[in-house]
Each structure stands twice: as C-alpha cells, then as structure tokens.
Amino acid sequence: MGHQQLYWSHPRKFGQGSRSCRVCSNRHGLIRKYGLNMCRQCFRQYAKDIGFVKLD
C-alpha cells in the first residue's frame, strides 16, 4: 500500500476531523453555535462584522 492509497482514506463524516473553520480551514477551537463554523481566532476578528456585541 502506497502513500496515495492511505492518505485521507479514513472516512471523515463526523468528529473533529470532519469540521473546519470556514475562514482559515483550522480544525481547533471551532465555534459551531448558530451555524458559525469558525475557529475562535477568526470569530474574534469578524465578530463585529457579523453583528456580535461585547457586553461589559
């Protein structure tokens, strides 16, 4: 079995490996609430543009 046959051969239909950030394709720190599907770093960058307001 060569590398081409083994690379990404495992099915990724659920779990962390199946989801990624819609902005930067990162798989860590993903915020899925409200269908955001953004990592926390990108969320902080785009939160104001999306319409989120930081409360005191």
UniProtKB/Swiss-Prot annotation:
Top-rank lineage group of the source organism: Eukaryota
A GO molecular-function annotation: structural constituent of ribosome
The keyword Endoplasmic reticulum is assigned to this record: yes
Chief place where the protein resides: cytoplasm
Positions bound to Zn(2+): C21, C24, C39, C42
Residue intervals passing through the bilayer: none
Pfam families named among the record's database cross-references: Ribosomal_S14
Cofactor note: Binds 1 zinc ion per subunit.
PROSITE patterns: RIBOSOMAL_S14
GO terms under cellular component: cytoplasmic side of rough endoplasmic reticulum membrane; cytosolic small ribosomal subunit; ribosome
Function: Component of the small ribosomal subunit. The ribosome is a large ribonucleoprotein complex responsible for the synthesis of proteins in the cell.
Quaternary structure, from the entry: Component of the 40S small ribosomal subunit.
PANTHER family found in the cross-reference section: 40S RIBOSOMAL PROTEIN S29 (PTHR12010:SF2)
Homology family: Belongs to the universal ribosomal protein uS14 family.
Protein name per the record: Small ribosomal subunit protein uS14
